[in-house]
Amino acid sequence: TEKSNDVELHASFTIGRKGGEVITLTDAEGAVHDRITLPEMKTDISFGRSSEDGGLYCYDPPTPFAANGDGFVGYAAAPSFSAEPGFYDSARDLRIIVPEGTQVFYTLDGSEPTQKSTPYDGETLEITATTVIRARTFAEEMVRPSDTLTGTFFIHADHSLPVVSVTVDPDDLWNPKRGMLTVGKGVNKKEGLPFKNTVYRKVKNSGVKYESYVEMYDDAGKRIVSQGADISLNGDYSLDMPQKSFKFRAKSKYGEKTFKAKLFPDRDYEEYKSFVLRNSGNDCMWTRLQDGFQSRLMDLFGITVAHQAWKPYVVYLNGQYWGHMNLRERVDEYMVAQFEGMDLEDADQLDLLEASSRAKNGSNTEYKAMIKKIKAGNPAKKQEDLQYILDNVDVDNYFWFMGFEMFFGNSDIGNFRIYRLNAPGSKWKWLINDLDYGLWNSGFNSPKSYTKKSGMGQLNYDNTIFRKLLTVPEYKDRYLTIYGEIYRKLTTDTMMEVLDELVELIKPEMERHWTRWGPENDKDVISEVPTTAEGAYKYWQKRVERLRNVIRKRPTRLWDFTKKAFGLSNAEMEKYFGPKPPMPPEAI
């Protein structure tokens, strides 16, 4: 590359990172002046000739527009294990295979091996408990250390749920100033949520990402992911829960730019850019499936509006049992691209907005202009105002979104997303996210809350489009038809059947989970939570029964709320929603 008139010029071809390609430099007559065969290339490393001896070297950092600096000749060959990482019924003997001319150093605590770590001298390592082993080779001065070999060996790790092992340098977790899981000094929890001045919240808000290694197994115990990835904290108020949520993103600097695996059996995708291991959010110390349960209810309708898949996992962190967590798609432009059938590489073509209309990707300019114009319009009387909405909004998608939120009675609405492809003719769509407070209170009057003039929910999120469309009889009918379809299908019996299935799925893991986390339950977050393993498990059972009681009562109460909020007669209610269901006698 060269620079001319402040413009960087680049060659018209790219090179692969795997190596083996040949680059030839010729003059205009075709005479060859130089030819090199490329080695495997790592991110942000250049390869070229030394101006001193003409030899070929790798350079770190690259030096465009300047002479190459001190180079190195490559990387040491990586070590290997004598047995595959995975699950074993008894203690396991293990050796590390050392490439000729190298020295291996290894760790057992999740840290990156250095030449100050334990040297490996050919001995047999006896693995008697679940352990993460990390090994790395070192060679002569002009050769860089190898990539780190990471493997988790599970001993007597019997689980009914699939397992994921996460390895992170302990300093990135527990460092007193920058550790992701560090509370820090001087935190007064009595001041209320969110806790102020915690190290973990400062780390999350700074946007810092640490290096991790992820080994993920499917239901059959087959390893489907084994690679490095960025790791960072996920969540807002749920950050103050004892167990934190993690988000992971594949990066080419770790070798793979995506996770090439079918992470969710109910999704067709076989490649992901990112995912989340979620602590169940605000439901962390309650049922641990509230949000996922509602995702599964939406699945009963097919994919009508974008929402996250849900799959419960058992997590190990640096070889230590870390309890149950929920695998979720990460809500970002890549998730939306997959849902819309786009290539992941095209995700940057999407405008993705938060509920407040703040842009997460792309721009919010045209969305805000649209809302302003719709507010000023009168679609009930002016066809052009109605047509403007129809030209810019996927109305059915929006009505399904509103119908699900209204049925569930999400009292904490405000964490949804709005998106569209940034291209002529594209329409805005909605994505449902964060239903921790859906089906939480059978008496929450969502029809009234979502249709009020000041906006939806406690924080009055904009509902201009909804209120305007409801003034048009044809579209009020369309919304009530979609909402009624949701209502008729999600009977108490249907919801109970799905809930029972999910409870039975995670129940075998709950006693062990609460043995790990019950003593760390935080009464400054939720005052009533028990802080013993036995008490926490019984409390989990109590919260599940509370959820059952909500879904017993919700259809009956929602029928009345809907009738009043939309001004419907009994005949109209029966047309859209069927007869009012009686309150079940077992409802408390």
Regions flagged by a language model, labelled:
Residues 64-71, 162-164, 171-186, 190, ...:
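Middle-to-C-terminal accessory/interaction subdomains
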Residues 39-211, 217-228, 426, 542, ...:
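Short, compositionally stereotyped local motifs that mark structural "simplifiers"
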Residues 20-22, 33, 42-44, 91-93, ...:
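Extracellular structured ligand-interaction cores
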Residues 9-64, 227-239, 507:
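Conserved beta-structured recognition patch
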Residues 23-25, 47, 106, 135, ...:
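Residue-level detector of buried hydrophobic side-chain packing
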